[in-house]
Structures are given as structure tokens and as C-alpha cells.
């Protein structure tokens, strides 16, 4: 079962820059899928970096406020424990790969946490089968499509059985078909009771799986929408908020060239 996340008056600024996160308060329920959306540079990715612990340990800056995961303040969770608690999927999976072939990448986390050889084999096979990539275990990561690489990234996170998944624009390099398939993976993780936080521009593939959507502007949460509210949001308001339309067909229509007129 996933863990709840409680964020209180969170503010963060990168060294030498203004606030990237501004007084954010947010409660994420255990087993919930939430989407952080908004214009580029609004602070979505920075908020995910606080939740997964990359801020302030890998990204320096000024951090204030509180964040709790389950019953523990995040700062009291050791880095090794945090790595097992939170699985990460990034925009470009190559940025998180440590091995050259699929099996080695999925096994990497298990090896770091001292799993036995038999446990590693079992976890790798289960994660690969779950993501339907068992036929790729001996393949080089460099030969795979972006869609397959994202499946490997999910499998490598899933192998250590985290309770929380944090994803930063995971569909950015995927085509429409691969994006919908990625949505199926999220749906399956939700069915397992995992807590999932997704920073994303594309919304259409999440409309039937996300529980809530949070619009972020200038580092602050300015609007919260239920799934039903997001689906029924007027196009004019979507545009005003700087969001992409959650309706794929409407998006395709908007991108069509205008008919020539005399």
C-alpha cells in the first residue's frame, strides 16, 4: 500500500534565483494518483524533486516548510531508506540508467539493497513480466525505443517495491500510442495501491486514472480539480491557465492547419 504525503508551507529557491516553489501546502492520500500541471517553468519538477528527496541533497538552494511521508518527516528518512520508498521515473530514462543491458538495469537497485542472488533473479523477472519486457532482458538499452526505455525505468523502480512513484514528465518523448500504453502502466500501479505523483504537460492519457489535478503557476498551487472537473473544464479556461487540453481529439483539431480561404 502506498504512503500518504503531507506538505506544509513549502518554499524553495535554487541558489541565486527567486522562489521556484512558493508556500505550497498539499495533502496526498495513500494510493492516490495526483497530477501537477502548469506552464513550463512553473515549479512542477521542483516540487517532485522535494518529494523524492533530490532537493536539497542534489539541488542546492533555500528550503523551508515541512514534508512528511507516512508518519515521518522527510528529513528523518535516511537516503538509503528514501531510495527504497520512492521510485522515480524521469522525462528521459537514459538519465537514470546505470547499466548497459535491460536485466542489469532492473537488477541495479536490488543489488544496492543487498538482495540475495535468488531474490534479485525473482524480482527482475517479476518486474519484467509485469511490464511485458521479459523478452528484452538481454537487450542493450541503447537499442530500445523511448517507450521501451520508459518500461525499463518503471521495471527498475518496481523491482525494489516502492510505495510511492514520482514521475517527471514521463510521456515527453513518447508518441501517442506509447503514451496511452504508459497510462496503462500507471493504472496497474494504482491498482496495487501505490501513491503516484506525476508532473506532466500532457493530460489526455491521465484523465481516467488521476484522482486530482493541481495547476501550478509561479511556484504556487492556484487551482485544484477533481477528475470530473478537469474533464468538464471549458477550453477558454484551460487556455487561461496555460494548460494543454485534456481532450486528445480537440488538441488534434487545434493543431490542424486552417483551411485556405479566397
Q: Where are the regions that the model predicts?
A:
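Conserved beta-strand-loop-alpha-helix hinge in the C-terminal portion
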Residues: 220-248
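ABC ATPase NBD Q-loop/coupling interface
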Residues: 66-81
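A short, flexible loop at the N-terminus of ABC-type nucleotide-binding domains that lies
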Residues: 1-7, 12-23, 55-60, 78
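Conserved ABC ATPase signature
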Residues: 140-144, 148
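H-loop/switch region of ABC-family ATPase nucleotide-binding domains
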Residues: 200-201
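Catalytic Walker B motif of ABC-type/P-loop ATPase nucleotide-binding domains
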Residues: 165-168
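Conserved ABC ATPase "signature" region
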Residues: 118-136
